[in-house]
């Protein structure tokens, strides 16, 4: 590549030089691949992805005492009316204000947040289909009570069309309208129907017994690094 340009074609020559320099830089510039998608929720947390949940927006305090606090009320000098919090029952029930400033999250929302329980297990795994997705679960801690290990550990999965409970036994999946690791039949049945007759519902016996369906459940797993 010549670095000199002379004569009437000097302008074209300079353009060619510039193009060659740009090409050289581009060809030698390091490639920065896009980051891979997270493989699970634990990796999302580690890589600082953020998600805004539904159905309500909340303000999270991630600083105080290790973080993870859901703020349900705030007062401050935000130049609002002096009687801003002097409201009726329905206002306090539904919540009001601006979560970036002064607010009350709402008694219904506070009830939903505070009326929760959890059961945490150190081990939760199942086998492959050849082994009927047998459950292996151990190491309970939490405040919901254990409604898994004593009855459902080491049990095969059953559905309405496949009874792996006990050969010749009544189909627990058909009887209690779900799919689960039944064992003649259950002390938990989180895939059951929203019913209130005995043991027919979305059941976690150690917390709500056999007559009350849980309104909301989630089963979550993450890899232990």
Swiss-Prot record:
Compartment list: Secreted
Disulfide-linked positions: 41-60, 172-185
Protein name: Techylectin-like protein
UniProtKB keywords: Calcium, Disulfide bond, Lectin, Metal-binding, Secreted
A cellular component annotation (GO) from this entry: extracellular space
Membrane-traversing stretches: none
Entry keyword annotation includes Transmembrane helix: no
Function recorded in the entry: Lectin involved in innate immunity.
Entries under SUPFAM superfamilies matching the protein: Fibrinogen C-terminal domain-like
Expression by tissue: Expressed by the venom gland.
Residues holding Ca(2+): 164, 170
Domain Fibrinogen C-terminal: from-to ranges: 32-225
Top-rank taxon: Eukaryota
Keyword Acyltransferase: no
Site positions (Implicated in ligand binding): 176, 186, 198-199, 210
Coiled-coil annotated residue ranges, if any: none
Residue span of motif Cell attachment site: 75-77
Organism: Phoneutria nigriventer (Brazilian armed spider)
UniProt-recorded Gene Ontology molecular function terms: carbohydrate binding; metal ion binding
């Amino acid at each position: 590549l010549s670095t000199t340009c002379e004569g009437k074609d000097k302008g074209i020559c300079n353009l060619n030089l510039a193009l060659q320099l740009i090409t050289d830089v581009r060809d030698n510039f390091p490639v920065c691949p896009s980051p891979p998608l997270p493989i699970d929720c634990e990796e999302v947390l580690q890589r600082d992805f953020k998600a805004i949940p539904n159905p309500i927006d909340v303000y999270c305090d991630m600083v105080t005492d290790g973080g993870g606090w859901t703020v349900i009320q705030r007062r401050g000098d935000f130049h609002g009316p002096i009687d801003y919090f002097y409201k009726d029952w329905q206002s306090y029930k539904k919540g009001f204000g601006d979560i970036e400033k002064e607010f009350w999250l709402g008694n219904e929302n506070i009830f939903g947040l505070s009326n929760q329980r959890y059961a945490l297990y150190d081990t939760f795994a199942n086998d492959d289909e050849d082994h009927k997705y047998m459950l292996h679960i151990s190491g309970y801690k939490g405040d919901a009570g254990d409604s898994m290990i004593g009855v459902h550990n080491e049990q095969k999965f059953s559905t309405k069309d496949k009874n792996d409970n006990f050969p010749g036994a009544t189909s627990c999946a058909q009887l209690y309208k779900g799919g689960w690791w039944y064992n003649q039949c259950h002390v938990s049945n989180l895939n059951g129907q929203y019913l209130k007759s005995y043991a027919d519902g979305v059941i976690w016996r150690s917390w709500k017994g056999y007559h009350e369906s849980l309104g909301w459940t989630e089963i979550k797993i993450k890899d232990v690094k």
